[in-house]
C-alpha cells in the first residue's frame, strides 16, 4: 500500500513535535521554579521607646526623630519591609523634631508613617516574626524602658542567635546593657561597641538626669568601647552587632546593617 506524502510528513514530524513539547514544558517548569526561588525582601524592625518623660524634670523626651527617620530611609531604599515596634506597643513619643532635616520632613509629611509611630506593635506580639535585623533607635527615653524590659532582651537574643543583625544608635544601645545570649554571656562582651558617650552626656548637661551612664555600663559589661570626638560620626561593626555613637551616626549604622544583610547568601 502506498503512503501519501502528507501522511508520511505527519509521521516524521510527530516525534519532533512531541519532543519539542516536552522541552518546552521542562523549560516552563524550570522558569517557574526559578521564580519561586526568588528570596523575599528582608524584614527589619525599628524599635522605639515608649518613655516620654525626662527623669524627674517633667520635660518631655522619647525617641530622637532623626535616629529613626534616617535608618528608615536607608532600609526603605534597600527594599526592606519595615515594622515599628516598642516595648509596650502603642504610641512612641517623638523628640528632636527638626523639619530642616529632609529625612525628618519627609517622614513627618507622610501621615501613614507618623500614624505607625503612634500605634507601634509591642515586641511581645512580634516575637514570631523572623526579622533579619532589629534596629534600636535612640533618644533619652530609651534609658528608662529598654535596659530591663524582658521582651527587648528576648528579641535581641532571638534575632542574633538566628543569624540576624542587631543594631542600635546613640542611646539605643541602652537595649544592650542587659542583653545576654543563651550561653549567659552579655552580647556586648569582647565586642567593639559605640554609643552616646559619658562625655557627650555631660556636654548636654543630662548626666545627673539619666538613670545611669551608658558608656560606663557598656564597658562594665565587657564591651570594647570605641568613640569619636563629641557629636562626630562613629560606627562600630563587630560580627553581627552594629552600633553608632550619636545622631550623626544613624545613617552609617543603617548602611552597615544593609551591607551585612546583602552579603548573606539568599535563603541564609
Question: What are these model-derived regions, one by one?
Answer:
Residues 11-24:
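Bacterial N-terminal signal peptides
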Residues 26-162, 166, 174-268:
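Extended, subdomain-level signal for the structured scaffold at the beginning of enzyme domains
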Residues 170:
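Catalytic, metal-anchored helix/loop core of enzyme active sites in primary metabolism
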Amino acid at each position: 500500500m502506498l503512503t501519501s506524502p502528507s501522511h508520511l510528513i505527519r509521521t516524521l514530524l510527530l516525534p519532533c513535535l512531541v519532543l519539542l513539547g516536552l522541552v518546552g514544558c521542562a523549560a516552563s517548569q524550570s522558569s517557574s521554579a526559578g521564580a519561586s526561588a526568588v528570596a523575599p525582601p528582608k524584614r527589619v524592625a525599628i524599635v522605639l521607646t515608649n518613655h516620654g518623660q525626662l527623669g524627674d524634670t517633667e520635660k518631655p523626651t522619647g525617641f530622637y526623630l532623626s535616629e529613626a527617620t534616617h535608618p528608615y530611609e536607608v532600609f526603605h531604599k534597600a527594599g526592606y519591609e519595615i515594622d515599628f515596634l516598642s516595648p509596650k506597643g502603642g504610641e512612641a513619643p517623638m523628640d528632636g523634631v527638626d523639619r530642616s532635616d529632609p529625612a525628618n520632613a519627609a517622614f513627618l509629611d507622610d501621615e501613614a508613617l507618623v500614624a505607625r509611630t503612634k500605634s507601634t506593635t509591642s515586641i511581645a506580639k512580634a516575637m514570631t516574626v523572623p526579622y533579619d535585623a532589629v534596629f534600636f533607635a535612640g533618644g533619652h527615653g530609651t534609658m528608662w524602658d529598654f535596659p530591663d524590659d524582658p521582651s527587648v532582651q528576648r528579641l535581641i537574643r532571638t534575632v542574633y542567635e538566628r543569624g540576624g543583625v542587631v543594631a542600635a544608635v546613640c542611646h539605643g544601645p541602652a537595649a544592650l546593657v542587659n542583653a545576654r545570649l543563651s550561653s549567659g554571656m552579655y552580647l556586648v562582651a569582647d565586642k567593639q561597641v559605640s554609643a552616646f558617650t559619658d562625655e557627650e552626656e555631660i556636654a548636654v548637661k543630662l548626666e545627673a538626669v539619666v538613670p545611669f551612664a551608658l558608656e560606663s555600663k557598656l564597658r562594665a559589661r565587657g564591651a570594647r568601647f570605641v568613640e569619636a570626638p563629641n557629636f562626630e560620626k562613629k560606627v562600630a561593626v563587630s560580627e553581627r552587632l552594629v552600633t553608632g555613637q550619636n545622631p550623626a551616626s544613624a545613617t552609617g549604622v543603617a548602611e552597615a546593617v544593609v551591607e551585612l544583610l546583602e552579603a548573606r547568601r539568599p535563603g541564609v
